Design a protein with these regions (language model features):
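Active-site loop-to-helix "anion-binding N-cap" substructures in soluble metabolic enzymes
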Residues: 1-230, 234-249, 256, 261-271, ...
């Protein structure tokens, strides 16, 4: 198949489906025909989560990518997640519906900058959050997710000199609960950085009995207000297992779909966008990159087999090692 120049320029296929096409049904048909599975992160829109074979957080998606028998994986999330799938299953085709689906955290740590930082700190091990490019992972000793970071760090020698990046907030939290003094990269998620103490405090006045759940990518003062601190999977588990009927949720709004699906008798209140200096609200509780995934793009990527993720062999050889070490330790 010859790729159109406009597809390559755009980074995705924008061909319209034939009139009357049931996108979900056609996606499921093509998955069966091509031995493909749809993997979706909790932050994608509800229609995609409902159409997916597997929905999870970064850790669960990595595990699924490593164990699946499918020959084709469509990773509905962001680009580093598709790279992780390819690293763990190099012989399989990994499709990414939109190559523009990046990550502000991954963008905050370039491989050349990390390499220089390592050279300035000889003898240090590098712990990289999974929200990084394959090139950064290739410079890393072990990868972590928000769901297993503490568990992994706890297993490293107490006298180990550690660099943690790129999420400053997650690293700061891990330092606080482990007593470590890791050197922290100054990166952050554009969504979680914008949650504020004042907006959560306002919600607590409206819902005094609600449990506050906050993602570990949030700033320290926000985490200090939270009753539950953890990954998206941690939040889901807590909501399912506890009797509280109301939850204030400080993470990307896509998780509300799965929370409501699994706990239909409970109320989940998203922390609203903060008000800017201009008085305007921003949609900062949504990740613009996750929302680049659409049913039409999934339909097209399955139909045409593009965009497919490819990673330089030399980078892939080094990048897969810290991911495999993470899976062993967690």
């Amino acid at each position: 198949m010859k790729l159109k120049k406009e597809w390559i320029k755009q980074g995705f296929i924008n061909e319209p489906a034939p009139e009357g096409t049931d996108l979900k049904a056609e996606i499921r048909r093509m998955c069966k025909e091509k031995n493909a599975i749809i993997l979706a992160h909790y932050y994608t829109v509800g229609d995609i989560q409902d159409c997916a074979d597997f929905v999870g957080d970064s850790l669960a998606l990595a595990r699924k990518a490593a164990e699946t028998d499918a020959q084709v994986m469509v990773m509905c999330g962001v680009h580093f997640m598709a790279e992780t799938c390819k690293l763990l299953s190099p012989g399989k085709t990994v499709l990414c519906p939109d190559l523009n689906a990046g990550c502000s955290l991954a963008d905050s740590c370039k491989a050349e900058d990390l390499k220089k930082f390592k050279e300035e700190h000889p003898g240090y091990q590098v712990i990289s959050y999974v929200n990084t490019t394959a090139a950064v992972k290739a410079l890393t000793d072990v990868v972590v997710t928000s769901g297993n970071a503490k568990k992994v760090v706890d297993q490293l020698p107490l006298d180990a000199k550690l660099i943690f990046g790129p999420d400053y907030n997650l690293g700061n939290y891990i330092n606080s609960v482990t007593g470590r003094k890791m050197l922290l990269w100054n990166g952050g998620c554009h969504v979680h950085e914008r949650f504020s103490v004042s907006r959560i405090a306002e919600l607590k006045k409206q819902y005094p009995h609600a449990v506050v759940m906050a993602h570990l990518e949030c700033k320290g003062p926000v985490l200090a207000l939270a009753d539950v601190k953890g990954s998206t999977a941690n939040m889901l588990q807590y909501a399912k297992e506890h009797d509280a009927k109301q939850f204030i949720v400080a993470t990307e709004a896509g998780i509300l779909h799965e929370l409501q699906r699994t706990c239909p008798d409970k109320e989940f209140i998203p922390v609203p966008p903060e008000i800017s200096e201009s008085g305007m609200e921003c949609s900062c509780n949504e990740c613009q990159y996750m929302k680049m995934n659409t049913l039409l793009k999934i339909y097209n990527t399955l139909k045409y087999g593009w965009p497919a993720v490819e990673i330089d062999e030399a980078i892939a050889k080094d990048a897969v090692k810290p991911i495999e070490r993470m899976l062993e330790l967690s």
